[in-house]
From Swiss-Prot:
Keyword Ligase: no
Signal peptide: 1-24
Lipidation (N-palmitoyl cysteine): 25
Protein name per the record: Oligopeptide-binding protein AliB
Cysteines paired by S-S bonds: none
Lineage: Bacteria, Bacillati, Bacillota, Bacilli, Lactobacillales
GO CC terms, sorted: ATP-binding cassette (ABC) transporter complex; periplasmic space
Family: Belongs to the bacterial solute-binding protein 5 family.
GO molecular function: peptide transmembrane transporter activity
Biological processes, Gene Ontology terms: peptide transport; protein transport
Domain of life the protein comes from: Bacteria
Keywords of the record: Cell membrane, Lipoprotein, Membrane, Palmitate, Peptide transport, Protein transport, Signal, Transport
Length: 652
């Protein structure tokens, strides 16, 4: 059985929506060397080889380097690997390591050189520890599945080899055009064997001294619900591209939205996420009328999903077993789920965090971003839309582009609910159906968002038919019932809102997360990966998994993406997940230089990284940002084209 935890994200990350995510702009006056802002989720550990949650990987991206990284245009460029080659058959990738890369302790003391064996050690450790990210590599690296499943105990049979101190080689099961993008995931990062042995079970615990550093920064402080601090690694192999000396992040629980702007105005923060619905926003808007920037939407998608097999009821408004049973029957009914989908007013939901002006700027309507890949000159989203005609007239003419709501339709919602109610009453279901949705009690935007959903669904379908019960929890209760719950049975809700950032450049990175055998998001649906469940079969996830397996066999990019468009269309029609918003698309103020930071659609070396980021004294203007964005987009197109052409040089 292959089981994984997802590199999924909580709503808290969405609410902040800034940090270096904008890669925003300004003039060239770069006096400051410190980046100050906030963070919203403590990491459970720093074990980048075993963990796969964003709370960990976003930190480690700044502390540990892998083979490759992203530049400011999203190209994959050398990092610890100076160069690489791939065999003609696409099965063997060989990386030549730089000789000046070193490991350092958290105090900055040199520990050892980085060698090819460190990458072998890293993957073996990840396999032995049953890493949450094994789904990324288990079926990719030759022999790894046999080692993980116990068919062999000899790791030397696995397709990762240290040919010498400076050469590491991976042999794949089948060609993967996107393999290099996988090397940006922390499961393929190196680790020093001697240090690993010396730490034992303490390796990677939530303490700066628990790991070694070969990246741009050293962690100087990690205090739960208080602060995270980094200092530039002066001996880093690429120190010339690290322009910030100190990074200081202060814990933010969402209870005092105005504090972000206050600290920015006082000079304590480098950036500030703005909340258009806050009581002080009109004053802020007048004060900073020439400085408010809306960031671009990025590749992280958020969506609601139903718990198909709920076992825990610690946080519920249900008072009887018949209410619990009725809800379980309802969420298994496709017409009911579609009714909820069409009754969900996403524009109103977006307005709770972005105000009326920016309400649609964050909306995303597919799990796979509509422009993530193209198929014969058409965006992925366009092709998915063309597939929807196969699923009924309710989907005709739908547009899945970002930044608008194609779903909200009270007439469709009522029609679907009428069908659902007839089917459910025949099974003895009692109405209204109660759906529990948890939210942190300190998360003002989250509470406003859930309240908006409650209002739109109950007003369209009637509170005598459906009731959204808002469960306001403490931070620890919220985490333990959702994001940090260890099993599907511990997931304590009927509706969940989470996000997924892509691990590699292929639609499967999003759609595989619901695979019944290994899906990284499956537990959030109340299902355990690899375990038979009649609820999964009842909603068609067995068919969905078969479609994934067939698509994964296809190596021709156009044909492959076409198959994944079919799968995305199936998922939309099923309404098992309800796409909502993306990261980005949010208003902020900042003092960072124009599009200097790394940019990436996948992995951990893009928006998460402070390498390349430049801080300045002057506040960025809206006009400066617009001009810089236009310039960057043009340069990006040219740079990406050149990088694509140069790939052929690596085939040997």
């Amino acid at each position: 059985m292959k089981k994984s935890k997802s590199k999924y994200l909580t709503l808290a990350g969405l609410v902040l929506g800034t940090g270096v995510l904008l890669s925003a702009c300004g003039n060239s006056s770069t006096a400051s060397k410190t980046y100050n802002y906030v963070y919203s989720s403590d990491p459970s550990s720093l074990n980048y080889l075993a963990e796969n949650r964003a709370a960990t990987s976003d930190i480690v991206a700044n502390l540990v380097d892998g083979l490759l990284e992203n530049d400011q245009y999203g190209n994959i460029i050398p990092s610890l690997a100076e160069d690489w080659t791939v065999s003609q058959d696409g099965l063997t990738y060989t990386y030549k390591l730089r000789k000046d890369a070193k490991w350092f302790t958290s105090e900055g003391e040199e520990y050892a050189p980085v060698t090819a064996q460190d990458f072998v050690t890293g993957l073996q450790y990840a396999a032995d520890k049953k890493s949450e990210a094994l789904y990324l590599v288990q079926d990719s690296v030759a022999g790894l599945d046999d080692y993980i499943t116990g068919k062999t105990s000899d790791f030397s049979t696995v397709g990762v080899k240290a040919l010498d101190d400076q050469t590491v080689q991976y042999t794949l099961v089948k060609p993967e055009l996107y393999w290099n993008s996988k090397t940006l995931a922390t499961i393929l990062f190196p680790v020093n064997a001697d240090f690993l042995k010396s730490k034992g079970d303490d390796f990677g615990k939530a303490d700066p001294s628990s790991i070694l550093y070969n990246g741009p920064f050293l962690m100087k402080a990690l205090v739960s619900k208080s602060a995270i601090e980094y200092k530039k690694n002066p001996n880093y192999w690429d120190a010339k591209n690290v322009f910030v000396d100190d990074v200081k992040l202060t814990y933010y629980d969402g209870s005092d939205q105005e504090s972000l702007e206050r600290n920015f105005t006082a000079g304590a923060y480098t950036t500030a996420r703005l909340f258009p619905n806050s009581s002080s926003y009109e004053g802020i808007k007048e004060k900073y009328k020439n400085n408010i920037i809306y960031s671009m939407q990025n590749s992280t998608s958020y969506f609601f999903n139903f718990n198909l097999d709920r076992k825990s009821y610690n946080y519920t408004s249900k008072t009887s077993d018949i209410e619990k049973k009725s809800t379980q029957e309802a969420v298994l009914n496709k017409n009911f789920r579609q009714a909820i989908n069409f009754a969900f007013d996403r524009t109103s939901y977006g307005a709770q965090s972005e105000g009326k002006e920016g309400a649609t700027k964050i909306l995303r309507n597919l799990v796979v971003p509509p422009n993530f890949v193209s198929i014969k000159g058409k965006d992925f989203g366009e092709v998915v839309a063309s597939k929807m005609v196969n699923y009924g007239k309710e989907w005709q003419g739908i547009n899945f582009a970002d930044g608008q709501d194609p779903y909200y339709n009270p007439e469709k919602a009522k029609a679907k609910f009428a069908e659902a109610k007839k089917e459910l009453e025949a099974k003895g279901v009692q109405f209204p159906i109660h759906l529990d949705k948890t939210v942190e009690v300190t998360d003002k935007v989250g509470i406003q968002g859930v309240s908006s959903i409650k209002q739109s669904i109950e007003s369209v379908l009637g509170s005598d038919n459906v009731v959204i019960d808002i469960q306001q929890l403490t931070s620890d209760e919220f985490d333990s019932s959702g994001y940090f719950a260890q099993t599907a049975a511990q997931k304590d809700y009927d509706l969940y809102h989470g996000g997924w950032g892509p691990d590699y450049q292929d639609p499967s990175t999003y759609l595989d997360i619901f695979n019944t055998n290994s899906g990284g998001f499956l537990q959030n649906l109340g299902l355990e990966p690899g375990e038979a469940n009649d609820k999964a079969k009842a909603v068609g996830l067995d068919v969905y998994t078969q479609m994934l397996e067939e698509a994964n066999k296809e190596q021709d990019p156009a044909k492959r993406y076409e198959k994944y468009a079919d799968i995305q269309a199936w998922l939309i029609d099923s309404s098992l997940v309800l796409p909502s918003v993306s990261r980005g698309g949010t208003p902020s103020l900042r003092r960072t230089v124009p599009f200097a930071a790394a940019y990436g659609l996948t992995g951990t070396k893009g928006v998460e990284s402070y390498k390349y980021l430049k801080v300045q004294d002057k506040i960025v203007t809206t006009d400066e940002y617009a001009k810089a964005r236009e310039k960057w987009l043009k340069e990006k197109e040219e740079s990406n084209k050149k990088a694509q052409e140069e790939l052929a040089k690596h085939v040997k």
